[in-house]
Swiss-Prot record:
Disulfide bonds: none annotated. Residues 6-84 form the RRM domain. It comes from the Eukaryota. One of its GO terms (biological process) is regulation of translation. The modification Phosphoserine is found at residues 133, 143. It comes from Mus musculus (Mouse). The modification Phosphotyrosine is found at residue 151. Keywords: Cell projection, Cytoplasm, Methylation, Nucleus, Phosphoprotein, RNA-binding, Stress response. The modification Asymmetric dimethylarginine is found at residue 103. Cold-inducible mRNA binding protein that enhances global protein synthesis at both physiological and mild hypothermic temperatures. Reduces the relative abundance of microRNAs, when overexpressed. Enhances phosphorylation of translation initiation factors and active polysome formation. This is RNA-binding protein 3.
């Protein structure tokens, strides 16, 4: 887990910022073991965020405090520990690796929990989820079941 402790999420990147530029801006805080700018699989264009792993977790904390909210290549960046941001602010539409598609109904404990407990569950990327049957009368057994039949076989 030591490598995870030194791993930072960097969001709000300029689409032209690459690994080298990111490393150049953060290397003054200490030795870096890995720099990744996440790219779209098909277009290879930056998705506007990345990760930096410091060999020493204390260096990562120093970098996070100093660089969060700073400007990099003309964009204000957000820097946080990697584990926090992946679950917290970005967990909504993805629901923690798609587990929101289970039929449990409660969903407490999946993802961050911030989006799952909203009444009706609409507006946060869960439109296709089957967890909300009956809450809004849309895609459930009361409308004939034709939406659910394809998924239940």
């Amino acid at each position: 887990m030591s490598s995870e402790e030194g791993k930072l999420f960097v969001g709000g990147l300029n689409f032209n910022t690459d690994e080298q530029a990111l490393e150049d801006h953060f290397s003054s805080f200490g030795p870096i073991s890995e720099v990744v700018v996440v790219k779209d699989r098909e277009t290879q264009r930056s998705r506007g965020f990345g990760f930096i792993t410091f060999t020493n977790p204390e260096h990562a904390s120093d970098a996070m405090r100093a660089m969060n909210g700073e400007s990099l290549d003309g964009r204000q960046i957000r820097v946080d520990h990697a584990g926090k941001s992946a679950r917290g602010s970005r967990g909504g539409a993805f629901g923690g690796r798609g587990r929101s598609y289970s039929r449990g109904g409660g969903d407490q404990g999946y993802g961050s929990g911030r989006y799952d407990s909203r009444p009706g569950g609409y507006g946060y990327g869960y439109g296709r989820s089957r967890d909300y049957s009956g809450s809004q009368g849309g895609y459930d057994r009361y409308s004939g079941g034709n939406y659910r039949d394809n998924y239940d076989n």
